[in-house]
Every structure is written in C-alpha cells, then in structure tokens.
C-alpha cells in the first residue's frame, strides 16, 4: 500500500482550526484527528510568542490531559534537535506559515521556555483547574485555605457516616423529620432507600437551598398543585362531593336488577356504604374508597382503565342513572390524577427533608476536615467567577488567561459551560490587558457524548456553539466553525456501513442537532480493505428448561445464548490469530499486510455483566491471550477477597469461614482434600483442628498464620506489606490469578496508606471499611500487552483496534434504567426542583412527561453508544447478539443494523462457521 496523502481540503481545515488569531469551534467525527488539531493550536500559540501561562487547555479526563501534554512536549523536545530544513517542515505541518530565522530560533527554545515557565503550560481537567483556582483564592471563594479533595472512596465513607447519623438521630427523636423518614420507608426497603439517597445526592444544589421551603414550594408550582390541596382533602372529595354516600345502597338495589357484572358493582356499593360511617378510622375510610373506586375503574394507579358501568339492558331501563354514573366516573378520574399529583408532592417533600438533612451533615463532615469533593470544586469555582469582582480574580490568575482550549466539549456539563462562559466573557468584546487577540477554542463531537451519568449535556454542544458564535460576531471578533469529517482511522467500507446505519430511518436522532442532516464520513485510507459481518442472533430455546436445577443469576452455562455467542467469538478469534492462518490486517508502520495478533482485537460490551465474564472465560478456555477486565470492582476481586479473609483470620482465628477461605487461597494453597481431612467431625474450631494436625501442609499453614497474627496489631499497610512481600503473598496470588491481580493488590495497599492518613490505623477498622466498599480500578488497556481486550464501550472511548467485535447488541436501556428522581422546573428561569416517583404507575402528569423525556434521552444516548462502538474499528467489524425467548426490541442495535444493511447491494450470504444451518451477512470493500 502507498502512503496516504491528506487532501488539500482537510489540510486547509486543520490550518483554519489551529489558527491562533481567531476563535474556533471544531465539530470532529470519530477518528478525524481532533487531538492533533488541538496540539497544533497550542504549539502555534507558543510560536506566536504567547506566554505558556496565558494558555489554558481543559480536557475531560486525566488520561486525556496526560496524552495532550505528552504530544505537545514531545513535539517541542523533538524540535530542539532538528536541522533547519526539517524544523521548517515541522513548523509548517502545524499549519503555521513558513518560518523565518527568528521563528526557527524561537521554535528551538519553546521546549525550555514552556518547561521553565512558573506554573508551566496548563493542560488539565476542569476539576484540576477549579481546584487550583480555589487554592489561589480560598478567602474569596469561602473554602478552607488548605483544603484537600476527597476521592470517591472517601466521599462515599463521609456520605455513609452522614446517612447513618441522621437516621439514628431521626429514629430516636420523632418530629417532622421522623414522619418524613417514615413516609419514605413506606415506599421502599433498606436497600432501595440507600440507592434513593445516593440518587438524591446528585441534586445537591437543590437540597442545599438556604431555606427548605424554597424547593418544596417550587415543587408545588412545578406539579401544578394548588395551595391547600392534599391527599386527605382530595380523597374526601372523591367519596363525598359526587354521588352522596347515602344513595350508594339505592344504587346497589338498582344494579341488582342487571347482569352478574352489574351485581358485582352492587356488592361494591354496599361494601363502600358499610365502611363509610362517622366517626371512622383511616383504615376504614381507605377500604371504603378502594371499594368505591373499584366500581368505576379496573386496577389502580396511572395505568388503570375506566370500565363499563352498566350493561346495555340496564342502561335502557335506567338511562338517568347511567348518565349520573358516567359523570361520576369522569369526576373521579380527574380527582385521581390530582391525588397522584398530591402523592408525588407529599412523597417528594419527605425525600427533600431527609436528603437535605443528610446533605447538611455530609457538608459538616467535610468542613470539619477541610475537604471538598469534585462537585464542590465546580460549584465553588463557579460561585467565585460569578462574583462582581471576578475580573480581578481572573487577572490575578497568572496575570490573566488569554486563550482557552476545550477538548471533548460534548461531555461538558451545564455548570462547566457556565465556568467557561465566565472565563471567556471578555474575549468576545475584545477587552483585556493583552495586546493580541484573546481566543476560545472548542473541539468535540456530539455523536460521541455518552457520559450523561457524569452530567454531560450533549444538547448544549450545538446550543453553546451558536451562543459563542453570536457573542464573538457581535463583538466583531473572528469566530469560525470548522467541521472535520475525514477519518484517519477506519476503512471506507466500515465507514460506509456506519453511515448507512445512521442515515436509515430515525437512527440519527440524538446524534445530530435537530433539523441537521447526517454528514457522511470520508476515509483517508481509501484503499484499505474493510469488512463488516452480521451474525445471526442466538436465541434461548422455547419451552421448559430441561435442567433439574436452577443456576445462580450471574452464571451462564452452555445452554445460554449469551454463552453461545461468547464461544463463537472466541472460536472466530482463535481462527484469526492461528499461526499460518490466511487472515491478515495492514500494519500501520509498513502499510503492508501482516498476520493478525491478539492485540489487534477489541471486544466491546455495554455493561460488565454475566456476558462480560463469560467472554473472558471463553477466551481463556480457547487459550487466547486476554488482557482481563478493563475495570476491577475492588471488593469483589478474588485476590482482595482472599486478602480480606487473611486479615479476618489473623484477627480472629476462630472465624471458620474466613480461615477456610484463606486456607484455599493462593496465600496458603490447600485444596478441598486437605480441608476434608480437617473439617468434618472436628471437635472444636477449624483453627484448633489445624493446630492439632501433624500434616506438613497444615503445619506450614499454622506457621504462616502465626506470622500474620503477630503483625495484625499494627497498621493495615504494615500487615499487608509483610504478607505480600516477605511472605511471598503477591508472588503466589499472581502465579494463580495472573498479572491482572497485581492492580487490585496495589490499590488495596494504596487504600491502606490512605486509611492511616485519615485516622488512627487499625486492621479491624480497615477491614470494616472494605466490607461496604464501592470502589473500582480502571486499568490502562491502551498499553496492554499483545492480548485481546474486552472492554465496555465507555471505557474504550478514544481507543481503536484493527478488528472490533460487538457481541452484545440486543439489550435496550429502558425502562429498567429509569431514574427514580426527576428534575423539574417552572416557567421562572433558574427555578428547579426534583420529584420522586418509584414506579411508572405512581406518575402524575408532570412526572410522566419528565419520565418520557428521560427515556427519550436514554434512547438517544443508546444510539450514540453504538456510534462510538462501531467507529473504534479500523478494518473489520463483527456484529453479533443474543436474546431470550422473546424477540429483541425493534429499537435495539441488532435490529437497527439489520434494517439498514440486510438489503444493501453487494451484501453476501455465507454459511456460518459454527454449523451448517445458520448464515452470516457479509459486506466486503
């Protein structure tokens, strides 16, 4: 293959995007070189003599910031050693004009100048920028002078403590908060309560209102609930303001004349009349109302339906009674809707009261220790910048920032956009101390916004582009919108298939702005062969499961369709990487064909569930090198579970379960036969039986336990450092579980050190903290060894591979993932509150609309997730899926892709490699 020449049009766009004299908004397709453009712009700013301290480059993750910094510094370091001609070519490659001798001299000095500048070139996450800003102005921002930033683990610990203390105080004290807590627990159990509070804490800005009645009154207005209207009053109106209770028995007599259905309603009228008396208990009135409503409606909640009230024969005889009953049904239906609204208000008010108390205690916990969390950084920095004297703050911040660059702009949250607006407020008007232009640069792709759970607001991407363009244009400052559509990554055949999928029907909804057309991708590697395969979906067999036992929920067996797909993928990969196979990919360096390696392959899934584990198991059973999980749930990792068991057994050897676990672990290495020689028929504890045994293996175990017990009184780090180091624990664990376990071990040791920094060290307290731990480790898969990578799509964003498998294409995001809490607003800008609705049947009209909006947003992100996944592929894309007895949802990825490509001209039908019955659809270019 030949070296690919970048088209002149693309080079022109790159030069325009990196032009340091104008503000630019770049909309970049996947693989279109946005990182290159951003780095080139930074370098061109430096080439123009802009001080490094005047440049602020904000990225979404620490890894992205490190990658960006490495690109810039590596390039500048390289320039220090180049000859004049080579340096000229490198400078021009950034988009800058041909340099003169002075500029060449400056280019050679840029590396030293950038490194030696106090504070250096600022390429960081927005949270890191906010942290630095608050450290510089703690008094003005009203934060502790030497605050620390709490990581997720410590934040979760503070939140658990705040929740525990508030619940303990509330349960014993009574009062309004006790009643609110009781109202919440009437709706959910202990586990659901914990999840509910976590979800509520995502709306802390609402919970931290100076006066609690403010969000509650906003809630009332948002729901459209009139003052004074509550559940009790509405229910009284249901029973008393329509057909008078005194007439219920008369209507029962009338209905007795009709059919069996009429007579059932007659019985309900009598029961309602019987339980309606004065004085009456709350329970009796509830039974009365249930009977009365059952006459008019089938079922309860929002999904209940109005039913026929009189049979045709009875309607002819008593038309007036029928008219009266249908009018009553209409009246009751309106009151039921209002009751759902009042119930939503009552339920949410209780949640706001309890969650606000927990939020307040959580804030006190942090303040007492001089700690801020990540949300605080954004909130406090925004409050500081919104002050009337914020210009002075910005000027003092390295004597002003003249150039702001934003990477991954599609993942920026609403609050973060406000910070960016404050930072660049004077840029559009041309105000400031700098003699040169002050510029704003943003690059992103709304099609790749998949982090809504972290606050990303994809709809704001286009909105903010238009807003910045209007502001700079109004201030007579140059502003350009540059689209980058040329892919430097994927083969034209892969890109063509992706275009066809998203051009089809409404598939582009949520990927492009309203009324915008789909912009087809262009491929730089126009001669690179591409392949897309659609495998038939694996379905669960219909009929009764022939197995005589029930498997655990998280375990798949050979009969499960998900396991079948995992085996097929592993079988295909084994063929691809088999020595002597005729399968080839094209080398990125030589541009020629070479055999497929395991590291060329990326398997992407939506979630880390049973299929994720089944896929890794299938690869290992096929003896295919696999990099393991991309993210480790620390407390659930087997190595950490073994180490926790070792700690517990050292503190209390009589804990038979902990001791048995550690005896079978790699730390000691006994097997089932060894335990069977000890455990059955023992007179005392397992530890006593172990001590009494003369077996050499058992003696070795006792000696290890003795060494561990001698260290158990010290700090957790000393305990585990000795166990893993001098005692050989790390070596033994990694020998059995593989090098992946090393990441979990390192994180456990880091947490042990953090535990010592935060409190008086204690192994027992540390193990107690680990018991409720919700902490995961993100492993670096980009630099993984030559092994197949199995990752979630979120974790793979920014990565690429020669060959990509999408084996999990039948799942859909709704309604299982519906939130329980919905954000509501009023007609007044800035007025926001929340509403809690546990299930759809409880929804009032306003919440039903909010739920529908949330589902639409989830569907949009679901489609964007498919775009991100499919654009990771360079040469080959294999698509598979599995489902249960029922057909998959028509809106799932598998159906989207099949509908767009199944009838495509040139598609081939080939026999499946796993049997002689199924067929694969194949597109080759």
Where are these regions (language model features)?
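Core structural elements
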Residues: 121-133, 184-207, 351-358, 372-381, ...
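Conserved helicase/translocase P-loop NTPase motor core
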Residues: 124-130, 159, 351-402, 416-419, ...
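Conserved ATP-driven helicase/translocase motor core recognized via long
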Residues: 2-3, 29, 54, 190-372, ...
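Conserved catalytic motifs of ABC-family nucleotide-binding domains
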Residues: 815-856
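Conserved motor-region signature of P-loop NTPase helicases/translocases
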Residues: 1-70, 74, 145, 151-153, ...
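Active-site-adjacent bridging/hinge elements
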Residues: 38, 99-104, 132-138, 329-333, ...
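Walker B catalytic acidic pair
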Residues: 408
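Conserved ATP-dependent motor core of P-loop NTPases, especially the RecA-like helicase ATPase domain
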Residues: 19-21, 59, 63, 76-287, ...
